[in-house]
Amino acid sequence: MDVRANLRSIRISPRKVRLVTDLIRNKKVGDAIVILNNTNKKSSVPVQKLVKSAESIAVNNNGLDADRLFIKEIFVNERPTLKRFRPRAHGRAYEILKRTSHITVTVSDGQQ
């Protein structure tokens, strides 16, 4: 059975979040949490919270065995970018793009 959890509008660039999510794809949930604990990236903290949330949903709401859970699917989508401007010399302004992400994780126990 598959269980899905979402984290929406996180203020980290999708490119940076994908570096972390690629490390834990198709891993057991326990192993993924250990990997995220030892990853020195800003995005590893919210991804770890999301994986723990998906695990608790699977165990508490659906009665799945926590030891059999693995990350079946994890992906990062880009949400609309916040555009800001930085003043520059001679009355010009440079655009700053503040990128944000949506993260979706699916955990499964391997059964239908």
Curated annotation (Swiss-Prot):
Q: Key word rRNA-binding present in the record?
A: yes
Give a GO cellular-component term: cytosolic large ribosomal subunit
Gene Ontology terms describing biological process: translation
Question: One matching Pfam family, short form?
Answer: Ribosomal_L22
Task: Please give the subunit comment from the record.
Answer: Part of the 50S ribosomal subunit.
Family per record: Belongs to the universal ribosomal protein uL22 family.
Q: Which NCBIfam families match?
A: rplV_bact (TIGR01044)
Q: From the Swiss-Prot or TrEMBL record, give the protein name.
A: Large ribosomal subunit protein uL22
The species is: Spiroplasma citri
